[in-house]
Amino acid sequence: MNKDINIAAIIKNEIENFEGKIQNHDIGKVIIVGDGVALVSGIEKVKFGELVEFENNVLGIALNLEQDLIGVVIMASENSVFQGSIVRRTKSVISITVGDQLLGRVVNALGIPIDGKAELDNSLKSAIFTNAPSIMDRKSVDRGLKTGILAIDSLVPIGKGQRELIIGDRQTGKTTIAIDAILNQKGKNVYCVYVAIGQKNSSVAQIVSLLEKKGAFEYTTVILAGASELSPLQYLAPYSGAAIAEYWMNKKKDVLIIYDDLSKHAIAYRTLSLLLRRPPGREAFPGDIFYQHSYLLERSAQLSNDKGGGSITALPIIETQAGDISAYIPTNVISITDGQIFLRDSLFNSGQKPAIDIGLSVSRVGSAAQTNLMKWASSSLKLNLAQYNELKAFAQFGSDLGPSSQLILDRGNKIYEILKQENQYPLTERQQIMLLILIRENLIDSLEQKSIPLFKSAFLKYCDSEPKFRDKIEKMDYNRVLEPNNLAGILKDITDFIEKFNLGNVF
């Protein structure tokens, strides 16, 4: 009897102390699902870009807001979502893990590690979609970002905070230039982010292996949305990379980010848009494809001193078809960026590597970031190459050329030999300036074209190993043009070296 009284008392106490907490969930139902996209009804208050959750904890992003249906891209296999599934609002936007813990890691577009290493601490997160810095939060580009590639650093220099497009046909060395730029940041306190969009997993694995071998992976993060990934993940990948880079920029760091490549990103977004039943435009791309790329690239900036002075330098890559830079996506990105490095397959196939077309390549703001010494040393280079290319076109018709014209042709051929550079072997600014002085002062005229590669190797070794000459070079002030006396001394040493080389006394 006492036992029954105790039970009754417990029940009575529970009833008296019961607090009914009502949880209000805004829910809807999946009407149609297929190809990674679900059309959902019933969650009218959802916001654009908001995360929604399906029954089995699968997440999606609301990208289409119509009167009766919401278009949601599914962030997992579509087989995990069924018609009639319940969908719930999360009232939050998609975010990604950020911080120094990402250095030396490979993650997917959602920030989940895919390199088999330790899990990440998810306490520090940042929204993937954020606004670009305002005009008042920026300042002019005034610091150079060295790629270690002579043709780029002298002719199309890149500054920290700049957006420089790398454009060309497939297999012309676009990714190679980007990776060389990452390798050259070693010891320069620049963090790097490499975003692979629609690339083969095997190719990205080779890049990661190379970065590890060269000691560059310790300051690099790789984001992979491979060719086998769903279109939503390929679409999100560059924005995830930008969010990771922005964290460091706001911490007063300099960041280099590579988008490889935005052509595949545009195709992924086109796929999503067509599945979401958006009206197609030119080349079947949606009307806001320009906005998607401008919104992404405007997040790269040189922040003002009041905002810490950090920077994001972006090197987006675009693949062209048969060298056609007048297609829709190439012209879009060219108009958004601060210049482009155009790679031509005919140059690549002829052995000119990097295969940069000097006439079509330009840097609109990077020259302001060059040191005065580099500006002086490279001042005549573009003119020499322009004269060479103009004369070369006439020479193809078999016209008789005078001695002065022949000299310009011979000099141009030798300059192109000097500009050839092996990948994975960046040059220091000091080495670049010495090679440019050879060209500026016409010292290469006394060399044979076929001996240029051997001479270049021997000359760079001489610059680093000859104590007296090295001391003269190291005393050069990069912010000032060479004084006549100092230049005369350097030119005498170079002339003596060339004479020894021509006599076969240099090995």
Curated annotation (Swiss-Prot):
Question: Gene3D superfamilies, from UniProt?
Answer: 2.40.30.20, ATP synthase alpha/beta chain, C-terminal domain, P-loop containing nucleotide triphosphate hydrolases
In what way does this protein cross or attach to the membrane? Peripheral membrane protein
Keyword Plastid in record: no
Q: Which Pfam families match?
A: ATP-synt_ab, ATP-synt_ab_C, ATP-synt_ab_N
Q: Which domain of life is it from?
A: Bacteria
Reaction catalyzed: ATP + H2O + 4 H(+)(in) = ADP + phosphate + 5 H(+)(out)
The UniProt entry's GO CC annotations, sorted and at most eight, read: plasma membrane; proton-transporting ATP synthase complex
**Residue numbers binding ATP:** G168, D169, R170, Q171, T172, G173, K174, T175
Localisation per UniProt entry: Cell membrane
Its EC number(s): 7.1.2.2
Question: What is known about its subunit structure?
Answer: F-type ATPases have 2 components, CF(1) - the catalytic core - and CF(0) - the membrane proton channel. CF(1) has five subunits: alpha(3), beta(3), gamma(1), delta(1), epsilon(1). CF(0) has three main subunits: a(1), b(2) and c(9-12). The alpha and beta chains form an alternating ring which encloses part of the gamma chain. CF(1) is attached to CF(0) by a central stalk formed by the gamma and epsilon chains, while a peripheral stalk is formed by the delta and b chains.
Q: NCBIfam families attached here?
A: atpA, PRK13343.1
**What family does the Swiss-Prot or TrEMBL record give for this protein?**
Belongs to the ATPase alpha/beta chains family.
Q: What is this protein called?
A: ATP synthase subunit alpha
Please report the organism this UniProt entry assigns to the protein.
Mesomycoplasma hyopneumoniae (strain 232)
